[in-house]
Amino acid sequence: MKLILTISAMILFLITGCESGKQPANDFLTVDITANYSKKELILQDFLDVEYIPLETNEEFITSASMQAIGKNLIILRNKNGQDGDIFIFDRTGKGQRKINRSGQGSQEYTNIGSIALDEEKGELFINNYYSSQFIVYDLSGNFKRTLKYDKDFNFNSGKIYNFDQDNLICYDEIGNYKNLRKSAFWLLSKQDGSIVKEIELPYEHKISPFLSKGGWAAGPRNTELISQNGSWVLVEPSTDTIYSYSQDHSIKPFIVRTPPICSMAPEVFLYPSILTDRYYFMQTTKKQWDFEKETGFPRTDLVYDKQEDAIFECVVYNNDFVDQTPVDMWYEHGILKIINNDGIAFIKKLEANELVEAYGKGKLKGRLNEIAAGLNEETNPVIMVAKYKE
């Protein structure tokens, strides 16, 4: 497999090295991240169906709604930092089903919640207890089932663990990649015991980290390197010019090739895909610049590839349920927007109740969102926006 990938990378280098401005007749997209693209405006509702789910609020169900997973029937949330141990299960109408808290020092408990993966078919929650280098598995009632220990050199605290198939989780080791502990950052781990099932190797010559550090502090772009794509997975390794697609049968192929080569840039500019639809590929470029005193940086450019027009644009997307032109972040919104690209859902995003109450009072909402906001107050749980693929 490693030999095949290396040969593929060489072929891609030869192809992209003599690239013109026109998209080639290949199975992968080529993106010049230094180009000045024409502007394009899109209306979210023109290409996705949007549903709003107000979360039930009562004494038991009060949450900041950090979104962890969504299934056909359930929404899984935790509070913002995951330190209080609360896990909230809502149904797809927003009605609270169960609140679970198994925090503690016992062998069947967790000390923190880095993230949660849902296997809805088996009725299992995988709690990323990363301080202890383990996943703890519970049923949907919070009953302990098993513990999956993983190597202490791994660190999945970025929360990028997902349900890959019936037997495995797919994980991204962000800290290990940042510290250059190993060549690969993408792994399949067994749902039964946490053992390594497969190391997903991507070819590159030198490790290039998107992180910057100064005086013991580190900063990174926090875009998503592991993205679902309707059963397959998009893998972003910052050290290589090729973004790959990884399938359920473990085959791997080029998905996007960026130019110019990452090794030729200073500072580096990285490319991250995000929401993927039948027509549009949303992407974002992020420059490796950060001011540690002002805590600002990583300037971004929002792009979209329109497959129908076979062209790339700089893009802004508006939510038509707001009277004013209100942009929707389709690319990066850490802790607020969660990319799904699976099971008919493109993404989910939380809308804070106090912001909706204010917008409602100013007459800035319309349609179903306006109706929901009329029944909210500033202490109400957030509203979950679910953007679904059109049937």
Outline where the language-model segments fall.
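Blade-loop segments of beta-propeller domains
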Residues: E56-E60, F90, K95-K122, N129, ...
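Short coil/turn segments at the loop-to-beta-strand junctions that recur within blades
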Residues: E59-E60, N101-E109, K149-N157, P203-I208, ...
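Structural signature of eukaryotic scaffold interfaces centered on beta-propeller domains
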Residues: A65-I70, G114-E120, K160-Q166, S213-N230, ...
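Asp-box/WD-like beta-propeller blade repeats and closely related beta-sheet repeat scaffolds
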Residues: N112-I113, Y130-K183, K198-F211
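Beta-strand-rich domains and repeat architectures in extracellular enzymes and scaffolds
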Residues: D32, V50-G85
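Conserved blade-ending motifs and adjacent loop-strand segments that build the rim/top face
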Residues: P254-L271, Q308-N341, V357
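C-terminal motif of bacterial Sec signal peptides marking the signal peptidase cleavage site
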Residues: I15-G17
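Blade/loop signatures of beta-propeller domains
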Residues: K22-P54
